[in-house]
A protein has these predicted regions:
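Substrate-binding/active-site clefts of carbohydrate-active enzymes
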Residues: 1-32, 39-165, 186, 192, ...
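The substrate-binding groove and active-site-proximal loops of carbohydrate-active enzymes
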Residues: 2-17, 49-63, 134-150, 167-177, ...
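Hydrophobic faces of well-ordered beta-strands that scaffold small-molecule active sites
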Residues: 34-36, 80-82, 170, 199-201, ...
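Conserved, mostly hydrophobic/aromatic
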Residues: 26, 36, 53, 73, ...
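Aromatic-lined carbohydrate-binding/catalytic grooves of carbohydrate-active enzymes
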Residues: 4, 25-65, 186-188, 467-483, ...
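Short, solvent-exposed turn/loop segments enriched in Gly/Ser/Thr/Pro and often Arg
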Residues: 34-44, 84-93, 173-179, 202-207, ...
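Carbohydrate-interacting/catalytic domains
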Residues: 1-33, 300-301, 313-320, 326-506
């Protein structure tokens, strides 16, 4: 019968050498880090059923080739993040060895096995706890001392071994199933190996309020995770673009999320719109489409344009699931793991993605600038990203910049909105990606914008006016040998003094001849000098 299990054993030849050959493509796409799904030896193609934590799957390469892969990636400015699966192993593994494929004495084979204490047997050997009832994935007792030593503490632990091969961090699978004691030890040891290494958790909800198995988790308290997969923000964005939520409700949910997260975490969240665990985003966006004017495929692509503009201009680290940038479609696992369509990419989506990643890479404000909601009502959402005074949200020296991102999710109707920027914008706003387009003029910090159906625009503002200080003083009040000040040497010395004092403005009274009451405001001529 067609149980679907055969899908776990299909292999298409991808390996580390193939990824390395595509480093130039990844660089062109604007990628700075590669997050790899599990690479350790396993009998399945997804490799979440680990057989040997210390060995690269031979289908992918060797340990030596992986170390060379990391060195080459570093030379190209690419960090490597590994997927760590530590809540369960494979049944077909060195440690459990249910099928006797390994020379080791596995926990399934003998209670005398050095790995027996790692597992939770109900009735030995065939009845044991497994991940969500999948018998090929026996659960482990994560806080069992020998298991923690094996994964974390030993000099050749799984964590330390792969860090020393050159990786820059880990993404932890099903982190809510890892006990706090395990997670905190993992985090502490990771930072001992490399203080700059990153630890990312798979979290599907608000990571600041996660309750797992009755326990309030402390992911964002500084000793468990640096970041989490931002499925929560993805849900908010997709629901809005799909028309399931209107602007005000969407912004309320987003604001709630932002307020819950410390800035250090919100600006480090892994902002994804696709992953190996969910339907391909282009397939999702083709649903609930009004096909009276456009095909479902065209609507999906336009919706993706909006979502990509959002992803690449929000605080956080945008993460591209391979193939999403090329228009790959697919249903639920494993259909969402199709091969990359080399030579058959959707050039429109790929070009838009590259334009957005390039803009983000060039703009400090889009990475660590303030996030400022401007308008959220009905079908339209607009927000700003801003750095002023040469300092970003964390007080780090960055280049000033100001952007406004606006989008209309309606599939058939344009929307014209008046957006008030509360003093943020003045002068003209130009299109950040297409600067030859007609600029939009702001009046009293407000501008009017017409957005076609299913469209997004990124506007670049002039540098924010810097706050300045100065003095109000008429030249005649300056000290001078004759008693009355003038615009001679004393005035020049006064200008030097103002500069030294950090002042940048000198406002003077009119220089026209005084008339009635010795007032220069009542001069005979505005063009006469005194």
């Amino acid at each position: 019968p067609d149980t679907g299990e055969i899908a776990f054993y299909d292999f298409y030849g991808g390996n580390l050498a193939g990824i390395r050959e595509k480093f130039s493509y990844l660089k062109e796409l604007g990628v700075t880090a590669i997050y790899l799904n599990p690479i350790f030896e396993s009998c399945t193609n997804h490799r979440y059923s680990t057989a040997d934590y210390h060995r690269v799957d031979p289908f992918l390469g060797t340990n030596e080739e992986f170390a060379a892969f990391c060195r080459a990636a570093k030379d190209e400015g690419l960090a490597v993040i590994l997927d760590g699966v530590f809540s369960h192993t494979g049944a077909d593994s060195i440690y459990f060895n249910r099928f006797g494929h390994y020379d080791s004495v596995g926990a399934y084979q003998s209670k005398e096995s050095p790995y027996y204490s790692w597992y939770r047997f109900k009735e030995y050997p065939n009845d044991y706890e497994s991940w969500w009832g999948v018998m090929d994935l026996p659960n482990v007792e994560e806080t069992e001392p020998s298991y923690m030593d094996f994964v974390i503490h030993n000099d050749d632990s799984v964590l330390r071994y792969w860090m020393r091969q050159g990786i820059s961090g880990w993404r932890l699978d099903v982190v809510d199933e890892l006990p706090a004691a395990f997670l905190r030890d993992f985090y502490k040891t990771l930072k001992e190996e490399n203080p700059e290494a990153v630890l990312i958790g798979e979290v599907w909800e608000d990571a600041s309020n996660k309750i797992s198995y009755g326990e309030q988790r402390e992911y964002l308290c500084g000793y468990e995770l640096d970041s989490a997969m931002n499925y929560a923000l993805r849900t908010i964005a997709v629901d809005f673009i799909m028309g399931r939520k209107e602007g005000r409700r969407m912004l309320a949910e987003m604001t709630h999320l932002i307020e819950n997260y410390p800035p250090e975490h919100f600006y480090a969240m892994l902002n994804l719109i696709g992953s190996h665990d969910i339907e391909r985003i282009l397939t999702v966006l083709a649903k609930d489409a009004d096909t009276n004017t456009l095909s479902a495929e065209d609507i999906a692509k336009k919706r993706l344009h909006l979502l990509l503009a959002w992803q690449m201009t929000m605080p956080g680290a945008p993460c591209i699931y391979y193939g999403d940038e090329a228009g790959v479609t697919g249903g639920k696992d494993p259909d969402n793991r199709r091969t990359y369509p080399w030579g058959h990419e959707d050039e429109e989506i790929l070009s838009w993605t590259k334009e957005l990643t390039g803009l983000r890479r060039r703009s400090d404000a889009l990475r660590t600038g303030r996030f400022i909601p401007l308008y959220a009502d009905g079908d339209v959402f607009a927000y700003a990203r801003s750095i002023e005074g040469g300092r970003d949200i964390f007080g780090q020296k960055k280049e000033d910049g100001f952007f406004i991102i606006a989008m209309n999710k309606n599939t058939t109707s344009l929307r014209t909105v008046s957006v008030y920027t509360n003093g943020l914008a003045y002068g003209e706003l130009t299109n950040a990606l297409y600067p030859r387009m007609k600029p939009i003029r702001t009046i009293n910090s407000r501008f009017t914008l017409t957005l076609p159906p299913l469209s997004a625009v990124i506007l670049k503002g002039q540098e924010t006016r810097k706050k300045r200080a100065g003095v109000l003083l008429h030249p005649t009040s300056l000290p001078s040998a004759g008693g009355n000040g003038d615009l001679g040497p004393n005035a020049y010395r006064f200008i030097d003094f103002l500069k030294t004092a950090g002042q940048s403005l000198w406002q003077i009274l009119p220089l026209t001849p005084p008339l009635m009451g010795d007032s220069p405001y009542l001069a005979r001529s505005a063009f006469a000098g005194n």
